[in-house]
UniProtKB/Swiss-Prot annotation:
CDD domains: RRF. Keywords: Cytoplasm, Protein biosynthesis. Responsible for the release of ribosomes from messenger RNA at the termination of protein biosynthesis. May increase the efficiency of translation by recycling ribosomes from one round of translation to another. GO terms for cellular component: cytoplasm. The keyword Protein biosynthesis applies. This is Ribosome-recycling factor. It is found in: Cytoplasm. Belongs to the RRF family. Its main location: cytoplasm. The gene is frr.
């Protein structure tokens, strides 16, 4: 695995962690809160964002305007039964969701969830590091790399891993600050 391939693979783990962070409520309306919602539409689970236009008219409201008004009830049901805790308001054309301010208790829960997502990202990075180091050790064992080259490669891999872990920790602290901001 080249250094560039390693960075690309690790970047994908960072992006996955960031996507997870984006699904955490912060007390402000954000369209990415609805990214994980799937709607039963003509017998198939369909992502909400492919069935409707999702906008944030103000900082406390999310508006969902379906392309097909026949899907309105299904969208409303999917939002109501999701784990987000939102109550959708259906006016026959648009579904509005009021995003209530977070209580202190909910803020702490969301910080724990963000920490969990960060830890999952770090574990993924460590697994990538382990695989890369195993490949280097195998190359050394097969005689493709000298002992010094192997050590240098392993140090480079470790430095890259450390940089990416710092990146996740930075994103986590930013998300926690955003969650705790009243």
């Amino acid at each position: 695995m080249s250094n560039q391939e390693l960075k690309t693979t690790m970047s994908k783990s960072i992006e996955a962690a960031q996507r997870n962070f984006n699904t955490i409520r912060t007390g402000r309306a954000n369209t990415s809160l609805l990214d994980r919602i799937s709607v039963e539409y003509y017998g198939a689970e369909t992502p909400l964002k492919s069935l409707a236009t999702i906008t944030t008219p103000d900082s406390q409201t999310i508006a969902i305007q379906p392309f097909d008004l026949g899907s309105l009830a299904s969208i409303e049901k999917a939002i109501a039964t999701s784990d987000l805790g939102f109550t959708p308001n259906n006016d026959g054309k648009i579904i509005r969701i009021n995003v209530p301010p977070l209580t202190e208790e909910r803020r702490k829960e969301f910080c724990k969830l963000a920490s969990k997502y960060a830890e999952e990202g770090k574990v993924a990075l460590r697994n990538i590091r382990r695989e890369a180091i195993d490949r280097v050790k195998k190359s050394e064992k097969d005689g493709d790399l000298s002992e010094d080259q192997s050590r240098d490669e392993q140090e480079t891999i470790q430095k890259e891993t450390d940089n990416f872990i710092k990146d996740i920790e930075k994103k986590l602290s930013e998300k926690e600050a955003e969650i705790l901001k009243v």
